[in-house]
């Protein structure tokens, strides 16, 4: 087997010419093994077929993760574990956002399924507004409107869509989650849809301004998922619950039928 060149030989020679440096290091070497004297044992036979595959962004010191780069790890069993990461300084197109919403089943590593106590420590950073003054219609073609009994929403069939609530959808990003977290804000207000417990009505929570960072107020965040022509809004704070409608009931949080969790986003 060919001998691997000593990449640190020149560096050692350079340091050895500096007597002050050498003397300063000598006393440390009594208690600490020298970095340059480190030896490496050959791989055991049972380790020969275990490896980790990394893309170029992981092997270069100066590279930065772009939006679509992945870190790919191959487990001993041959199972591919893949996690997409987002770069905060990378411009993200509408096509990229749609791809995330459409691709929710891609990940095998799913930090978004972590317990809420862990999720509450995650920071979500403002990215940009991705929909302005859009209307949400459920699978029965009912539109979301304000309920006059309080800070609630309800769904009803409208002949004039101008009466429907208009929402701004704001995208956020974090290092831990691969899905797309969004907030739903009533247009031209600071009223945000806030998730509650199962079967409880969602609330309209007034904020002083659009949050630049969300850490504790995760009730305001929903993972936007898209399957075919339908859109779903899964609570970040309650990952098993979705924004839902039901006949003669306020807009609420539900895990599925008999409540309706399917929506369509209608642009103005």
UniProtKB/Swiss-Prot annotation:
GO molecular function: copper ion binding; cytokine activity; interleukin-1 receptor binding
Modification type Phosphoserine: residues: 87
Main location: nucleus
A Pfam family it matches: IL1_propep
In-chain residues carrying the UniProt-annotated modification N6-acetyllysine: 82
Region of interest: Nuclear localization signal (NLS): 82-86
GO annotation (BP), single: inflammatory response
Positions annotated as propeptide: 1-112
SUPFAM superfamilies: Cytokine
Gene3D superfamilies attached to this UniProt entry: 2.80.10.50
Subcellular location: Nucleus; Cytoplasm; Secreted
UniProt entry keywords in alphabetical sequence: Acetylation, Cytokine, Cytoplasm, Glycoprotein, Inflammatory response, Mitogen, Nucleus, Phosphoprotein, Pyrogen, Secreted
A GO cellular component annotation in the UniProt record: nucleus
InterPro entries attached to this UniProt entry: IL-1_alpha, IL-1_CS, IL-1_fam, IL-1_propep, IL1/FGF
Glycosylation positions in this chain: 102, 141
Function: Cytokine constitutively present intracellularly in nearly all resting non-hematopoietic cells that plays an important role in inflammation and bridges the innate and adaptive immune systems. After binding to its receptor IL1R1 together with its accessory protein IL1RAP, forms the high affinity interleukin-1 receptor complex. Signaling involves the recruitment of adapter molecules such as MYD88, IRAK1 or IRAK4. In turn, mediates the activation of NF-kappa-B and the three MAPK pathways p38, p42/p44 and JNK pathways.
Annotated domain remarks: The similarity among the IL-1 precursors suggests that the amino ends of these proteins serve some as yet undefined function.
Family statement drawn from the similarity comment of this UniProt entry: Belongs to the IL-1 family.
Subunit-level organization: Monomer. Interacts with TMED10; the interaction mediates the translocation from the cytoplasm into the ERGIC (endoplasmic reticulum-Golgi intermediate compartment) and thereby secretion. Interacts with IL1R1. Interacts with S100A13; this interaction is the first step in the export of IL1A, followed by direct translocation of this complex across the plasma membrane.
PANTHER family according to UniProt: INTERLEUKIN-1 ALPHA (PTHR10078:SF33), INTERLEUKIN-1 FAMILY MEMBER (PTHR10078)
Protein name: Interleukin-1 alpha
């Amino acid at each position: 087997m060919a001998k691997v060149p000593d990449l640190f030989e020149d560096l050692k020679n350079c340091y050895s010419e500096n007597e002050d440096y050498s003397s300063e290091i000598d006393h440390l070497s009594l208690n600490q093994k020298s970095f340059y004297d480190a030896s490496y044992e050959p791989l055991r036979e049972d380790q020969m077929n275990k490896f980790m595959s990394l893309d170029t962004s992981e092997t270069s010191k100066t590279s930065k993760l772009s939006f679509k780069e992945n870190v790919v790890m191959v487990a001993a069993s041959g199972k591919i574990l893949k996690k997409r990461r987002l770069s905060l300084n990378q411009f993200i197109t509408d096509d990229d956002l749609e791809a995330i919403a459409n691709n929710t089943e891609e990940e095998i590593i799913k930090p978004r399924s972590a317990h809420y106590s862990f999720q509450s420590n995650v920071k979500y950073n403002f990215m940009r507004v991705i929909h302005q003054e859009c209307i949400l219609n459920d699978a029965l073609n009912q539109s979301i409107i304000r309920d006059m009994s309080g800070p609630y929403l309800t769904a009803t069939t409208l002949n004039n869509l101008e009466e429907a609530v208009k929402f701004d959808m704001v995208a956020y990003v974090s290092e831990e989650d691969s899905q797309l977290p969004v907030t739903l804000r009533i247009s031209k207000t600071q009223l945000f849809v806030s998730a509650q417990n199962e079967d409880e009505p969602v609330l309209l929570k007034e904020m002083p301004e659009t949050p630049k960072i969300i850490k504790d107020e995760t009730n305001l965040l929903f993972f936007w998922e898209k399957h075919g022509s339908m859109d779903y809004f899964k609570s970040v704070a309650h990952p098993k619950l979705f924004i839902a409608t039901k006949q003669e009931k306020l807009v609420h949080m539900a895990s599925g039928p008999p409540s309706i969790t399917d929506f369509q986003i209608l642009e103005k």
